[in-house]
């Protein structure tokens, strides 16, 4: 956008008078990387946060916009979703390092009144349509229309708790890092200063004991403190809540990225245990753990990666965390773990984490763009984690990008083949139902499906399912709906939205339905997978 690109959005704010104490320090646009500047103030960010739509802003800027019920239109024409805010610790660290290298002062938070003045001026000066006033309900974190019932939630968390209780290998079997020093020269540095802690509630004896070990100068104390935290939170729900404090979380943020395998592994396992309780899930994510968990997933030890995948699964169960975890980049490393992890449990947890993330539309698109569909279809062919993969494919088939990728990837033939392989085996009942569910989702409002299903011989196997004495009523109901689609629902070309779409295509081609019926079988225009 030339020289007007970065500051065009708020170019007027330089004319507002402000004292040095209220106006944040300004850095030359030619020297400061664009991504370090808040899109609203145009200044170096002191406390960067990621919003739900993926952009990074100064925290106070987001707070002002939310308080004024205003969603700014950015210079690229987009309007950010301010419903969720998560600290961008990686960006903050990068900015501070950049300042140190360039011998610049660290950025200070802008004055609230100054930012409010900037935003209000923007609201008053923009032409109609350039900004967007929104209702409070649009700014507050969204609530899913079809949220999981308590029984569903309890079922999922019961599985995670069971996994946590059985996952702890003997702590003495964990290898110590060969180069581990006996002592550190400094104590563990958390993101809080001692003065910050003075305003916190007093510690319980249990928390104080763990806290003292985690802040010790001795690495062995760190290990012992983490092992104690891990064991204490493994099965006691009350303790999991009481020990999920800002103090402990701050120390865990430092320890989870430790270069010592045993420290990193026990820190990750402790996060899994703490995340089991619903009140802790939002707290952990809002404390900035997701980027750290992703880093460990990409480059940590094998056992630490396994625990991190379990933590992401547990955190993704919470509705308000799904968007944030997706925005911060968990999808691709989870897909890699699903495909390549040596641990069966890690692969299963990765599939479940991705399933819960895919319950919201934005994450479905991320999965499709990351190449999830061909990868998962390949796994279905080889029989890997079939039931859970099929659940994921059901979700992806619900979005247009996913449905298109599945049809292009020969999903109908693969799914029908999977049904034939499973037969009526009780052991494959879940996979069969998920397989039929995926086919049903693909069939909805899609003209290509009928031809592809016919080529794959779907009608025969689906008829067997409906007429079989075994199988659940839900399975038979889904199969019946697909058969109705294949048989035209009382009309050769179907009814409703599909028929209307078909007629529009025929009219656009200059053909009538009768012309198509007469000539379509002679090679000119076949309703098949080539369509």
Swiss-Prot record:
Keywords: Repeat, Transferase, Ubl conjugation pathway. The keyword Repeat applies. SUPFAM superfamilies: ARM repeat, RING/U-box. Pfam families: Arm, U-box. Residues 180-189 have a biased composition (Polar residues). One of its GO terms (biological process) is protein ubiquitination. Residues 31-105 form the U-box domain. ARM repeats lie at residues 237-276, 278-317, 319-359, 361-401, 403-444, 447-488. It catalyses: S-ubiquitinyl-[E2 ubiquitin-conjugating enzyme]-L-cysteine + [acceptor protein]-L-lysine = [E2 ubiquitin-conjugating enzyme]-L-cysteine + N(6)-ubiquitinyl-[acceptor protein]-L-lysine. It comes from the Eukaryota. PROSITE patterns: ARM_REPEAT, U_BOX. Pathway: Protein modification; protein ubiquitination. Residues 190-201 have a biased composition (Low complexity). Its EC number is 2.3.2.27. Residues 167-205 are annotated as: Disordered. One of its GO terms (molecular function) is ubiquitin-protein transferase activity. Functions as an E3 ubiquitin ligase. This is U-box domain-containing protein 39.
